C-alpha cells in the first residue's frame, strides 16, 4: 500500500494526516481532496467544545467510547500543545430535568451566583475541565504538523471512486483521474452518498443541521468559557472576543437555519442570566451539517481498498484524533 487518498479535510481528514505524520509513514504519496465551496466543512461551522459532559465508564458503549476519546484528546493537548485549543471550564446546569442532571453531575449545587455567572433565580450547576477550540487555528495547526508527509492537496471534489485491477480510480470535478492503492472517505455528512462502494453500509446515516449565532467584538472578560443551561449553549472566546449562542438541531440536509429556534435560545439565555447580551440582529448565523449514524455512534468501515470513517455527530473534535489512530491501526492489520 503506497498511494493513499483521503477525501475530506475537516477534523476527521486532518486528524488522519496528523496521526499518519506521528506514526509510521507507510505511504509514498498522500493526496487530500477537499472542497469547502462545494460541500461546506462542518468542522468550520461548529461550536467545538471538547468536554467530558458528566460521562463515566460502564454505562453505555457510546459513553465508554466518548470517555476514551476525551482521554486521548487530553493527552494530545498535554503532550503536543496544539495551537487553537484552550483549556476552559465547562459549566453545565439548569432548572429542568433535574433528576437527569443530578444523576449525570452529582457534584453540582443550587446557587444564584456561580463562579463567573449570576442567574435570575437559583439554578443547579456543575463544572468540569474542558477544551475550547478555535476551529480555523486548530485545523491549520494539524495540517502544518503534517508537513513531514508526502502530501498533495487538491481543492477538488471527488465525483466517482471505482476499484479497478491497478487500484482505486478516483475521478474529480475538475476532470482529473487518479489511481490510488487505498482511499479513505472522511467526507462528513457527504459520506452517506457513497453507499454503492460500502455495500450500502452507510444507508442509515442521517444529515442533521446545527446552527448557532456568532457575535464579534464582544468583551466578556479575560476568561474563555462554555455554559450549557438546560441544553442552550453560550460559548465565549476571550482570545478573539467572539460569543457563540446556540445551537439548534434539525434532521435535514439543507442549510437554511431555524431563525425562530435561535431567537428562542437567545431569549431563554437572556432571561436566565444577569448578563447583557449583544443585540440579536448583530449576530452572524453559522450553519453546519453533522452526520448522525445509528445509535449516534461513530463508525469505521472497510470494503476492498476503500475505508470510511465518520458519524462524529456532536463530538467531532473529541473523536477526531482518537478515531484517526483507530482506523490507521486497522489498516495496518489489513496491509
Ligand atoms: C452547530 C454545531 C455545533 C457543534 N458542536 C460541537 C462541539 O461542541 N464539539 C464537538 O466535538 N463537535 C461539535 N460539532 C460536531 C462537529 O463539528 C462535527 O462532528 C465535525 O465537524 C465533523 O467533521 P468531519 O471531518 O467528519 O466532517 P466535515 O468537517 O464536514 O469535513 C468533511 C469535508 O469533506 C469534504 N468532502 C466531502 N465529500 C467530498 C468529495 N466527494 N470530494 C472532496 N471533498 C469532499 C467537504 O468539503 C468537507 O470539507 C458541532 C457541529 C455543529 C454543526
Identify the role of each PLM range:
Residues 1-12:
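Beta1/beta-strand and adjacent pyrophosphate-binding region of the FAD-binding site
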Residues 12, 38, 190:
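Conserved Rossmann-like nucleotide-cofactor binding loop
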Residues 21-43:
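Glycine-rich FAD pyrophosphate-binding loop
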Residues 47-127:
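Dinucleotide-binding Rossmann-like beta1-alpha1 core, especially the glycine-rich loop
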Residues 57-69, 125-141, 256-261, 318-321:
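Short beta-strand to alpha-helix junction loop
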Residues 152-168:
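A conserved short coil-to-beta-strand element within the FAD-binding core of flavoproteins
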Residues 176, 180-267, 275-281:
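Flavin-dependent oxidoreductases
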Residues 280-335:
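C-terminal catalytic lobe of FAD-dependent flavoproteins
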